[in-house]
Amino acid sequence: MMPRLQEKYEKEVVSALMDKFGYKNIMEVPKLEKIVINMGVGEAKENQKALEAAVEDLAKITGQKPILTKAKKSVANFKIRENMPLGCKVTLRKQNMYEFADKLINVALPRVRDFSGVSSKSFDGRGNYAIGIKEQLIFPEIEFDKIDKIRGMDIIFVTTAKTDEEARELLRFLGMPFAR
């Protein structure tokens, strides 16, 4: 079965974007390529259990096993050595990506306290969008009494759009609640 958001993209968003930007070919229309969710766990250098808990949380949220991210080089001031695991990340594509985007837009973001929309300034100039989340509790899979610590995460939407304007419209049509 096709995810709800993918169906919406194919049925409504493609034609809306073609009208708005005047694309000649359907293959020119920007689409979501992947979503990368990254959790940096600073205290992992002293406490490996913290990293395991973060990996478990991220696996619950995304339904996919995260890979560990390691330090590129040693930094004495931060007390880190090269190849020391310091976080975890998941790359979602295809169906999993649409399922996650749907859950983020329609379930998780509305649960954020004092939520007034996501910033429309977090585009990188190449049509990718980044959003930071302060706590993992906004996702329904995380049980409040089972977590050891509140952790945040970065979520990056990678699109095939050439410009930020095209990417913004793509995400807006998919339902991303941008702040006015």
UniProtKB/Swiss-Prot annotation:
Pfam families: Ribosomal_L5 (PF00281), Ribosomal_L5_C (PF00673). InterPro entries: Ribosomal_uL5 (IPR002132), Ribosomal_uL5_bac-type (IPR020930), Ribosomal_uL5_C (IPR031309), Ribosomal_uL5_CS (IPR020929), Ribosomal_uL5_dom_sf (IPR022803), Ribosomal_uL5_N (IPR031310). SUPFAM superfamilies: RL5-like (SSF55282). Disulfide bonds: none annotated. GO terms for cellular component: ribonucleoprotein complex; ribosome. GO terms for molecular function: rRNA binding; structural constituent of ribosome; tRNA binding. GO terms for biological process: translation. Keywords: Ribonucleoprotein, Ribosomal protein, RNA-binding, rRNA-binding, tRNA-binding. The keyword RNA-binding applies. Part of the 50S ribosomal subunit; part of the 5S rRNA/L5/L18/L25 subcomplex. Contacts the 5S rRNA and the P site tRNA. Forms a bridge to the 30S subunit in the 70S ribosome. Belongs to the universal ribosomal protein uL5 family. PANTHER family: 60S RIBOSOMAL PROTEIN L11-RELATED. This is one of the proteins that bind and probably mediate the attachment of the 5S RNA into the large ribosomal subunit, where it forms part of the central protuberance. In the 70S ribosome it contacts protein S13 of the 30S subunit (bridge B1b), connecting the 2 subunits; this bridge is implicated in subunit movement. Contacts the P site tRNA; the 5S rRNA and some of its associated proteins might help stabilize positioning of ribosome-bound tRNAs. NCBIfam families: PRK00010.1. This is Large ribosomal subunit protein uL5. The gene is rplE.
